[in-house]
Amino acid sequence: MRIVLITQKEPFYLAENISYLLKKLPKESKIVAAVIANPSPFGNKESFLNKAIRTLNIFGLKFFIFYSLKYILNFFRKSKNVETILKKNNVSIIKLEKSINHKSSIEKIKSYSPDLLVSLQGNEIFKKPIIELAPKGCINLHTALLPEYRGLMPTFWVLKNDEKFTGVSVFFVDEGIDSGPIIVQEKVKITNQTQRELIIETKQIGMNLILKAIQKINSNDFTLITNDDSKKTYFSFPRKSDVEEFIIKGKRFF
């Protein structure tokens, strides 16, 4: 099964996740190419400067310094570079000049004859032509127990809201936000993890679930779980007041 990966240059966790995925991918499946968007590690797609200013204003100086140093250090580490990892594993890089939904982008991806698209932190909402490009569909990973906690930064919100459990879901992409039918899902217990620890834990579980979903799709052996709109909750980018409440409750980012 031929797979095209849609991802981004996220500098903190993603390269190691993709490296693991490539090592564990079943022999009957192959990632033949990848689309790599510019980094958007905390949600909204915007300029680097605006992202930095907004992160500082909302999350505070300590958070800003921690992730700024991580960003700078990881810039020089090959193990943290998504494109380097993919090229090392002989995955072709698809360069897009327009939005992924643009006709020219769709034609470039189509030229690799993918059976399945896999989105890992893709930072655009996909429209119908890209969703329907591959015969076996397009799947995505969300680090929450869908239909709850759709949207941005679910690890932040589950900690802030004092949840006892969260989860990881792999689902078929539709034109909504985290709203497609679920292929595989796993519940995760929340104890005293920091947000960073919970991100690392759920992303690792997510890679194993992506592998499981790929096997199920390839063998056409899966039963979809309803992603019930009537039970959905949705969260966007946190406000400063949300971060203040997070800290007052004794929650930790790292």
Task: Show where each model-derived region lies.
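One-carbon transfer enzymes
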Residues: 1-254
